[in-house]
C-alpha cells in the first residue's frame, strides 16, 4: 500500500498472507471469510501455496499464528460477462479463531458511491523502486463511480470497482493483490489491478466487486461448484 501507515495490529484479523510453497516468496494477500474459506485474486494462484493467518510482522510470529494450505481451489468460470479474477480457496482444515484471527463477513449490500474505503496489505510501499514492508500497511481511499472508472480505463468490464485518490499518492500496489477493499465496514472488493507505477493521479486501482459474486461464492461454499 502506497501512502499508508502500518496497520493497527487489531484491524486486520481476517487478512491472510499467501506464500509460494516452493520458493517461500511472499505473493499476495487474501481474506478469511469463515473457518475454512479464503478469497483472493486468481493471478495469485501457484501450484503449491502456504497460507498464513494471524500474521502481522513477517519476522515475528504470534503464538496464535496458523498455517494452512489449499485443499481445493475454485475459479469463477460461469458467465462470460464477469471477470474471471477471483479465487475461492478451501483450506486443508478449519482455522481456530483467536486474538489475531477472525473472519470478515461477506457484504449484505452493494457499496454506495463515494464511500471511504480501507485497504491493507504487505505489498509495495514505494513504486518505483519496489520496497516491501515487514508489516501490513493500511490506507483510506475513495470509491469512484463507474464513469470515472471508464474514463481512466475505457475497456473496463462492469463487475468491478475503482477506488483511490484522484490526485494520486495513495493506492494499493504490487503484492497487495487478493486483499480486501472494506467500505463502511463491509468487504466490498478484492484488490486486482492498478497502474504501474502505482498511485498515479486519475488512475484508480481496480477491484473485483464481491457483491456481484455472492451467489457463486455461497454456492461454492455450500458444495455446488457447477454454474446455475
UniProtKB/Swiss-Prot annotation:
Expression sites by tissue: Expressed by the venom gland.
Do you know which Gene3D superfamilies this protein is assigned to? Trypsin-like serine proteases
CC per GO annotation: extracellular region; secretory granule
Q: Which Pfam families does the entry mention?
A: Trypsin (PF00089)
Indicate which residues are glycosylated according to the record: 45, 81, 145, 224
Location of the active site: 43 (charge relay system), 88 (charge relay system), 177 (charge relay system)
The Peptidase S1 domain extends over 1-222
Enumerate the UniProt keywords alphabetically.
Answer: Blood coagulation cascade activating toxin, Disulfide bond, Glycoprotein, Hemostasis impairing toxin, Hydrolase, Protease, Secreted, Serine protease, Toxin
What is the first-listed, main subcellular location in coarse terms?
secreted
Q: Which SMART domains match?
A: Tryp_SPc
Q: Which reaction does it catalyse?
A: Selective cleavage of Arg-|-Xaa bond in fibrinogen, to form fibrin, and release fibrinopeptide A. The specificity of further degradation of fibrinogen varies with species origin of the enzyme
A GO biological-process term: proteolysis
Query: What intrachain disulfides are recorded?
Result: 7-138, 28-44, 78-227, 117-183, 149-162, 173-198
Summarize what activates or inhibits it: Inhibited competitively by amidines and guanidines, and irreversibly inhibited by diisopropylfluorophosphate.
Any one GO molecular function term: toxin activity
Query: Where in the cell is the protein located?
Result: Secreted
EC numbers on record? 3.4.21.74
**UniProt xrefs under InterPro entries:** Peptidase_S1_PA, Peptidase_S1_PA_chymotrypsin, Peptidase_S1A, Trypsin_dom
Q: Does the keyword Secreted apply?
A: yes
Q: Tell me, in a sentence or two, what this protein's role is.
A: Thrombin-like snake venom serine protease, that cleaves alpha-chain of fibrinogen (FGA) releases only fibrinopeptide A. Shows coagulant, esterase and amidase activities. Induces the barrel rotation syndrome in mice, which is manifested by gyroxin-like, rapid rolling motions. May also reversibly increase the permeability of the blood brain barrier (BBB) in mice.
| Miscellaneous comment | Negative results: does not have phospholipase activity, does not aggregate platelet, and does not affect the release of the neurotransmitters dopamine and acetylcholine in the nervous system.
- Subunit arrangement? Monomer.
Q: Name the family.
A: Belongs to the peptidase S1 family. Snake venom subfamily.
Q: What is this protein called?
A: Thrombin-like enzyme gyroxin analog
Q: Which organism is it from?
A: Lachesis muta muta (Bushmaster)
Amino acid at each position: 500500500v502506497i501512502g499508508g501507515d502500518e496497520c493497527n495490529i487489531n484491524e486486520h484479523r481476517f487478512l491472510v498472507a499467501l506464500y509460494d510453497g516452493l520458493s517461500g516468496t511472499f505473493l499476495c494477500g487474501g481474506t478469511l471469510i469463515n473457518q475454512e474459506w479464503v478469497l483472493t485474486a486468481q493471478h495469485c494462484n501457484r501450484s503449491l501455496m502456504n497460507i498464513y493467518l494471524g500474521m502481522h510482522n513477517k519476522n515475528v510470529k504470534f503464538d496464535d499464528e496458523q498455517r494452512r494450505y489449499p485443499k481445493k481451489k475454485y475459479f469463477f468460470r460461469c458467465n462470460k460477462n464477469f471477470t474471471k479474477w477471483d479465487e475461492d480457496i478451501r483450506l486443508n482444515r478449519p482455522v481456530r479463531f483467536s486474538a489475531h484471527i477472525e473472519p470478515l463477513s461477506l457484504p449484505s449490500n452493494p457499496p454506495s458511491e463515494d464511500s471511504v474505503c480501507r485497504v491493507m496489505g504487505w505489498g509495495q510501499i514505494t513504486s518505483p523502486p519496489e520496497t516491501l514492508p515487514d508489516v501490513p500497511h493500511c490506507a483510506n481511499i475513495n470509491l469512484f463511480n463507474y464513469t470515472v472508472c471508464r474514463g481512466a480505463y475505457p475497456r473496463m468490464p462492469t463487475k468491478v470497482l475503482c477506488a483511490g485518490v484522484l490526485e494520486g499518492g495513495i493506492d494499493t500496489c504490487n503484492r497487495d493483490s487478493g486483499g480486501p477493499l472494506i467500505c463502511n465496514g463491509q468487504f466490498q472488493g478484492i484488490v486486482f489491478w492498478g497502474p504501474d507505477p502505482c498511485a498515479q493521479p486519475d488512475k484508480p486501482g481496480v477491484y473485483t466487486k464481491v457483491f456481484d459474486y455472492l451467489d457463486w461464492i455461497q454456492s461454492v461454499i455450500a458444495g455446488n461448484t457447477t454454474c446455475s
